[in-house]
Amino acid sequence: MTTVTKHKVLLIAGPTAVGKTALSLALAKQLNGEIISGDSMQVYRHLDIGTAKIMPEEQAGIPHHLIDIKNIDQRFTVAEFVSRTTALIIDISARGKLPIIVGGTGFYLQSLLAGYQFGPADNEPDMAYRQAWFDRAAVEGSDVAWMALKQRDPQAATAIAPANLVRVVRALEYVHTTGQLFSEQADTHGDTLDAYTLCLTAERALLYTRINQRVDQMVAAGLEQEARWLFDQGGAMLPAGKGIGYHEWFPYFNGEQTRDESIAKIKQDSRRYAKRQLTWFRNKMSVDWINLLEHPELRASIDQRLASWLS
């Protein structure tokens, strides 16, 4: 029997403005780690302020990956994230270091952990198909998805527990999008990770205050000028032009709203995004929650949890 090497991977997740970057730097130093960005916008060159990108001089000598790898007119898909991150995990682990993935793009992180497979003609997952099964299972129970898989790929159904809805839906989606049996493709990724996920959180009022303050700091640092440059390059027509902190400026540049209205909209969109992030991590992923902003004394408990996981 072939023994599959399980790579240790630490994920630091959570909503925007909750303190992920500071914790990731501390843990990377402590655990001899390298950091992989799990943020869908930090891949873009020249967009530094609005993405809260950690700059080279702030990285404290810790290698950072998946930052500044795309031009603003290039798409960055979840399939590419999974592929690139998988390769990085293998490389970092082979060099005796710990891969630490930091970010708030929940779907990217979930896809990595669940080991979603993306065929060559299927560069993006079928979100509607996937969500339809999750919705149906919420009403009829997870067995309904497993029974469907049993009909379409009995061997896969035998290998997957009916209660493991994410994996069952993943198998159904693979059959649906590729026309091939899930049981016949080599799952070379999802089951080879020994992942531990810390999810930072905070009381909502405090989090929203921090978000508003962060937006003000970004504006003071030159966010408007960064957004104006993006607007002049094509704005909303570009993949990068859809990001929060950027597209809200475009109506102002077009003379359709005031500057203050644009800033207020960025704050509103950022707060709503943080709420969606928390909901995603709560409902879609298995995480250990921790509130360091209000309870810094819990930092020691993180070390204890990690020591147990790494042993």
UniProtKB/Swiss-Prot annotation:
EC supergroup of this enzyme: transferase
Binding site for substrate: T16, A17, V18, G19, K20, T21
Pfam name, any one: IPPT
Catalyses which reaction(s): adenosine(37) in tRNA + dimethylallyl diphosphate = N(6)-dimethylallyladenosine(37) in tRNA + diphosphate
Lineage of the organism: Bacteria, Bacillati, Bacillota, Bacilli, Lactobacillales
Subunit structure as annotated in this protein's UniProt entry: Monomer.
Source organism: Lactiplantibacillus plantarum (strain ATCC BAA-793 / NCIMB 8826 / WCFS1)
The protein's role, per its UniProt record: Catalyzes the transfer of a dimethylallyl group onto the adenine at position 37 in tRNAs that read codons beginning with uridine, leading to the formation of N6-(dimethylallyl)adenosine (i(6)A).
Reported cofactor(s): Mg(2+)
Any one GO BP annotation for this protein: tRNA modification
Residues annotated to bind ATP: G14, P15, T16, A17, V18, G19, K20, T21
Region (Interaction with substrate tRNA), start-end ranges: 39-42
Keywords (A to Z) from UniProt: ATP-binding, Magnesium, Nucleotide-binding, Transferase, tRNA processing
GO molecular function: ATP binding; tRNA dimethylallyltransferase activity
NCBIfam families: miaA (TIGR00174)
EC number of the protein: 2.5.1.75
Annotated site, Interaction with substrate tRNA, chain positions: T105, R130
Similarity comment: family membership: Belongs to the IPP transferase family.
Keyword match Magnesium: yes
Protein name: tRNA dimethylallyltransferase
